[in-house]
A protein has these predicted regions:
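N-terminal cationic and glycine-rich segments that engage phosphates or anionic surfaces
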Residues: 1-103, 108-447
Length: 447
């Protein structure tokens, strides 16, 4: 009853209600677009494409696009080109002074960085769209499925549509972030992944019930393990280290009384401050080697065959070793960007606060940096372990690969991380309007 009361309160806040409706509408548009097949392709003859993209690297890529990749949809490229562009721009920000300057200019600089990211996204789409179209026959689409043939008109129009589809998906994500609830790009990926969950479970269930020796028991064991992994993922996302902060008591003149302190408060430093972005970034990079190795000009060479063998098997040893290392690296990198310890120290000093035993200002900033480094290491390792856990599930329990992706890994971590982030935003609206949050009673707390 408390949850129902809280959900009722959500609809009492006009701004929050409008944001939720807009978000749901945008997500529905994205899911609808994922079912719209490119003009000139017979949708009834795409069965082989779906079969060939159920497992391995292509299966994961298809999950990221919510099935659009296997549908030869107008959204077949998904939002991954935008993520790739974001990675490139942020990495270039380390070495290029102009981008470093923009990063320090606040909102105005961020607008310029966003514009650069958009243009780079278009450039990446212009490369990926022809590659996707050329690969369709090798992925199982028969020649008769191309109703107008594979001439220049088909390629030109399809490239324009695929690039436009990616730009439109990028626009949807940005609008959700600005006018809706949650991080739009992450939500688009999450709903795509969720769309593949029922099919994956049904396939695993069908495979298990045909076993004569305890198939249903194995399903129950898998579900228990799944819930445990979800719980571990939630704990990782929610875990914080509290740093005690003391505030000097204000005087009537607006200053601070010397050696007279108010109540003690805390700065919550998250164990995984970077959220799901390291997973998304690392996964975007892991798509590259296998796809390059499978291209026509590479697939017959020794290098191409090695890349395909090592990086197309997402449950293989080397794939997961590199994946885990990238997650750890990106966790440190993204934490450094998203946790501005200098600004935190300055804000603390201006408000009359300090960490007991630590001088305000530079010393406080260095102390917070030290603490973040200490907690980021175990946090990044834990994140990497959960990310590669599906490989262990496949090897130890012979789980269907599509279903195994939800036992930790990119899919589950994105779902959990994005869901919690979105709930926290809703929670903040409720608390600002003097209602208890989603995890509390849902009562109006106005005095």
């Amino acid at each position: 009853m408390k949850l129902i009361e809280t959900l009722k309160n959500v609809w009492k806040i006009t701004e929050l209600k409008d944001r939720i409706i807009l978000t749901l509408g945008m997500l529905l548009v994205y899911r609808f677009g994922a079912q719209v097949v490119l003009p000139g392709i017979d949708a009834s003859k795409l069965g082989a494409l779906g079969d060939n993209t159920e497992q391995g690297l292509l299966g994961l890529l298809n999950a990221f696009t919510g099935g659009a990749f296997a549908n030869a949809s107008v959204f077949a490229l998904g939002i991954m080109p935008y993520i790739s562009a974001s990675i490139v721009v942020q990495l270039m920000g380390i070495a290029i002074p102009y981008l470093q300057k923009l990063q320090k200019e606040g909102a105005s600089g961020q607008k310029k960085i966003t514009q650069i990211t958009r243009w780079l996204t278009i450039a990446i789409c212009m490369v990926q769209a022809p590659g996707y179209l050329v690969s369709l026959p090798s992925l199982g689409i028969p020649q008769e499925a191309f109703l107008l043939g594979q001439g220049g008109l088909f390629y030109f129009s399809s490239i324009v549509i695929l690039v436009t589809g990616c730009i439109f998906a990028m626009w949807l994500g940005e609008k959700i972030t600005d006018k809706g609830i949650g991080n739009g790009i992450s939500l688009l990926i999450m709903v795509g992944i969720i769309a593949t969950l029922p099919v994956s479970f049904v396939q695993e269930y069908a495979a298990r019930v045909t076993e004569s020796n305890g198939g249903l028991i194995m399903i129950l064991i898998e579900l228990v393990i799944w819930f445990v992994i979800i719980l571990a993922s939630v704990m990782l996302v929610m875990a914080v280290r509290k740093i005690a902060v003391q505030y000097a008591r204000r005087t009537a003149s607006g200053g601070y009384e010397k050696n007279v302190f108010g109540s003690r408060q805390y700065i919550p430093l998250k164990l995984n401050a970077s959220g799901v972005m390291p997973i998304i970034f690392a996964q975007a990079i892991m798509f590259v080697p296998g796809l390059i190795g499978g291209m026509d000009f590479m697939k017959d060479s020794n290098v191409g065959q090695w890349l395909q063998a090592q990086f197309s098997d997402i449950f293989g040893l080397w794939y997961n070793v590199v994946f885990a290392l990238l997650i750890i690296i990106f966790t440190y990198f993204y934490t450094a960007i998203t946790v501005p310890t200098n600004k935190m120290a300055d804000d603390l000093k201006r408000s009359g606060g300090f960490i007991p035993g630590i001088r305000p200002g530079t010393e406080t900033s260095e102390y917070l940096d030290k603490i973040m480094s200490q907690i980021t290491l175990p946090g990044s390792i834990f994140l990497a372990l959960i990310a590669v856990f599906p490989a262990f599930i496949v090897k130890l329990m012979n789980v269907q690969q599509g279903w195994a992706l939800f036992f930790g890994g990119t899919s589950l971590l994105i779902m959990v991380g994005v869901a919690i982030d979105t709930m926290q935003q809703v929670n903040s609206y409720l608390l600002n309007k003097h209602y208890d949050g989603l995890m509390k009673t849902g009562k109006n707390r106005k005095g």
